[in-house]
Amino acid sequence: MKILIFGLPGSGKSTLAEPFADLIGGVWINADQVRSHYDDWDFTPEGRMRQALRMRYLADGVVLSGKIAVADFVCPTEQARQEFAPDYTVWMDTIKEGRYEDTNKMFEQPPHCDYHVSQWFDNTHEQLVEVVRHYMQRQADEKPDQVMVGKMHV
């Protein structure tokens, strides 16, 4: 399973993603760490699509290894989100503007998300575990031949 936690810079993506990934036995993939590793700080539309693809490949590798991938990155456009191809999306809608004007201008509100965080609570990551668990249970009921991975066995 590939989970995308996205939103404007400063919205709490990493603050949610790291403890959430730990709680579910998943692998946290942080966009800033990935950009640093590849020394790619290009935030043009092309650079952002390259980052979405890079994040997708890393997350797909995690899933192929039998774990849940939890990726957090801005992913500002619907095209970038589709390129990443998540199984589950979490929109961190906790701020109206981030610290980068170019990102604010290009950020597209999603037409759909699986979980919408509009206010941060100290236990948001724990609440998300239960929501994802129910989602995975519904998926298992619809497709009983699929195997759940990580700590998220249902």
Set out the residue ranges of the language-model regions.
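Walker A (P-loop) ATP-phosphate-binding motif of ABC ATPase nucleotide-binding domains
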Residues: 2
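Hydrophobic anchor at the beta1->P-loop junction of P-loop NTPases
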Residues: 5
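Conserved lysine of the Walker
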Residues: 13
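Conserved substrate/cofactor phosphate-moiety recognition/catalytic segment
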Residues: 17-58
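Glycine-rich phosphate-binding loop used to anchor ATP phosphates in small-molecule kinases
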Residues: 45-100
